[in-house]
Structure formats: structure tokens, C-alpha cells
Amino acid sequence: MRLTPSLISCLSLLHFTSALVAFPGAEGFGANAVGGRQGEVYVVSNLNDSGEGSLRDAVSQPGRIVVFSVGGVIEITDRIVVSKQVTILGQTAPGDGITVYGNGWSFSNADDAIVRYIRIRMGKGGSSGKDAMGIADGKNMIFDHVSVSWGRDETFSINGDVSNVTIQNSIIAQGLETHSCGGLMQTDGGVSLFRNLYIDNKTRNPKVKGVNEFTNNVIYNWGGGGGYIAGGSDGESNVNVIGNYFISGPDTSVTAFTRGNENFHAYVETNYYDSDKDGTLNGSELGVDSTNYGGMDLVTEKYDYPAVASVLSPDDALTYVTKYAGASKVRDSVDTQLVAQVESYGKDGALISDEADMGGAGDLDQGTTPTDTDGDGIPDDAEAELGTDPNTADSMDLDTSGYTFLEVWANSLVPSSYA
């Protein structure tokens, strides 16, 4: 279902959108993504792979805010390609939310994407040599509380002419063997990685080149390919690495940081490493010495990149990530197992070649489709609370905050901060 917004002056709209972050709690290089705020609403009303009311159809055209009137697993055959200026609000799905299973997604050239609270699980049946999520060009994107797993090449990768991207509060897990990679983060345009969990990837947790802010992440059970891999190339990289926790798992056989050189310039601060796999969390701070950071060129001043509002200690980052990372409005069976692995502190975890080892995508409660008399994406009971008219399609009108009423409702469904 598609509706155009009520008439609003372009000047007013541009004023509001330029001053807003993507949603309350958006941080980093991608914080000012606009998404579909200047477009129309599309309600995903079924779990079909394609056709009217499907998620694939929803993201196929630019300028849309996508909400859900159904929860469950969407099984796809071909990759989903996302258009420009699309907002995907998975937290609006009833029941246990949305999982997309069977192949990967491309966000290449999907400028101003906003993606929240959704699970993207590729699997061994997906396209060979492709990422579960990939960006090969584009700008101004933010991914928040996304669970991505089972990529056949990388799990979540960013390459090429890409600028201003944030991945925050997310889980990047279990790239499938024999490749098993967390992802490449290789652009000079700026990537922020905040409060994410990298888990059960043999290598590239992540592999970084260019401009990167890496703060309050948890990295668990990387394999012999490496944890945080510096570029290892002639190109210049300039990064901040702050407040992260690296925890060795059963498959870990190399140190947390590898492949740095004189061209990889890093400001590092308060990063912890628990290497003993003894089932007890007892990591200690890595000394600020190049040998502890894989031969990086360590600098003394932090790069002036868009930072998190509040930097957590590594211990607090671990607590936060295990409680809230991923599509955590309702944790599914896969993410629940992954978090349990982390909390074994070295005893549990595995590199896998088949998602069947995790029970596959699992089953989700589809929930109950809410009553939405005017079909504008906001349920009637929520319209009463917002003060909007349940008989008039006004969800894309602007609230005094500058967000559409649709965004105001969706933002109210989840915390802006989990502090």
C-alpha cells in the first residue's frame, strides 16, 4: 500500500530534514541519513518473496518508508536490491519481527538508507561469492539493530566509493565456511562501527582500510584468519579504535590485531583482550604499543570523527552488546545461541559451513495484524495516542519534531538509548 504525503512546502521539509538525525540515537558518519522521509509509506502485508505487499516490492522504488503489518520469515530466492532513500522499520512488525532468509541484499547506491531491527540471514543456498549485505557505492546510510549472518563471501561488507555509513548495535555473524568472513570496511569516505558483535567469523572482524571509527564493539571466536585486520597495504588509513573487547573462542588461534604497517595510522584507547578461553571473563587492557596492535602506526591524538555520545568501558560495552545488539526487540533462536556463546567466555562457539548447525532461520510468531482503518501504516490505537486521525491517511505529515508521524510512532516502539 502506497500513499503520498500531504502537501508541505519543500522549504520547510528541507529545513527539518537537514537538522535531524535519522532517528533518536543515530550516531556516527551515517547519522544524518534521511531515508524515505520525503516520500511515501509502503506497508509490507505478506511474507511473499515478490509481488504487491512484499518486502522486495517495498524497497524496489526510491523514496519510501517501509513498515510491516505482519511478522515472520520471508524466504527469498534472488538477492534483494534496495533503492535510494528507503527507510526500513523492522520494529513495526508484530509478533517476533522479520527475518529475511535465503539470499543476500545489495545496498549499492542506496543513498540515504535507514535500516532498523531486521534479521538478514543469507545461508548456503544464497548466491555463490556474494555478501549477505554489501555496499559497493553510495552515501549516507545507517544500519541499527540489524542481525546479519551466513554470508557466502563477506557477511557485511563496504567497498568502493562509499561515504558516511554507520553500523551500530548490530550482530555480524557466522560467515559460512570455507570463506567465513565478517566483512571488509574499505573506504576513505567514513564508516562508523559502534556497539556491534562480530562472532564466529574466521577472518575480517572486520578488515579495515581508509577512514574508520571502531568503538565499543565485541569480537568473539575469530579464526586463524584474524580478528581486527589492518589494511596491510600501501594505502593510507586513519582510524580510532576505542573501548572494544576481544574474546578468544574455540577457533581463535591468532591475536586480536594483525597486518598493520606504517601506513595504518590508529588512535587506540582502552581496548581489552581475554585470550585464555577459560570460561571466565578476565581480559586485560592492551598496552598502547604497536606490537599489541599488529604493527599499526599508533598516533597520540584522536581523529576528529563523529563519535558516540557516550563511550562505554569495554566491560560495559560487553554487557550492552550481549543484552541489546542485533534485532533485539525480540531475540530469535539464532541470536540467542550466539549471545550464549559469548557468555561462555571461550568455551563455546564454532565456525560453520551450514546454517542447519544453528537450526536454520527458525520459526517466528507472525503476530496479529493491527487494525489500520486509513491504511497509512499507523495502527488505529497508536493514532489515538499520537493525536492523528485514524480515518485520514496523515502518517507522512510532519510532527513538530521534524519527523513524520509514522517515524514518531515507529521510534516510540524501541528505546532511543539502552543506557
Curated annotation (Swiss-Prot):
Binding site for Ca(2+): 274, 276, 278, 280, 285
Residues covered by region (Disordered): 350-395
The keyword Transit peptide is assigned to this record: no
Cofactor(s) the protein needs: Ca(2+)
EC numbers, comma separated: 4.2.2.2
GO MF annotation: an example: metal ion binding
GO cellular component entries: extracellular region
Segment forming the signal sequence: 1-19
Active site feature: 204
Glycosylation positions in this chain: 48, 164, 201, 282
PROSITE patterns: EF_HAND_1
A Pfam family the protein falls into: TSP3_bac
Principal EC category: lyase
Highest taxon in the source lineage: Eukaryota
Subcellular localization(s) per the UniProt record: Secreted
Listed Acidic residues bias regions: 373-386
Catalytic activity: Eliminative cleavage of (1->4)-alpha-D-galacturonan to give oligosaccharides with 4-deoxy-alpha-D-galact-4-enuronosyl groups at their non-reducing ends
Cofactor note: Binds 1 Ca(2+) ion per subunit.
One GO BP annotation of this record: cell wall organization
Keywords, alphabetical: Calcium, Carbohydrate metabolism, Cell wall biogenesis/degradation, Glycoprotein, Lyase, Metal-binding, Polysaccharide degradation, Secreted, Signal
Bias (Low complexity): 363-372
Domain EF-hand positions: 261-296
Membership in a protein family: Belongs to the polysaccharide lyase 1 family.
Annotated function: Pectinolytic enzyme consist of four classes of enzymes: pectin lyase, polygalacturonase, pectin methylesterase and rhamnogalacturonase. Among pectinolytic enzymes, pectin lyase is the most important in depolymerization of pectin, since it cleaves internal glycosidic bonds of highly methylated pectins. Favors pectate, the anion, over pectin, the methyl ester.
Name of the protein in question: Probable pectate lyase C
Protein species of origin: Aspergillus flavus (strain ATCC 200026 / FGSC A1120 / IAM 13836 / NRRL 3357 / JCM 12722 / SRRC 167)
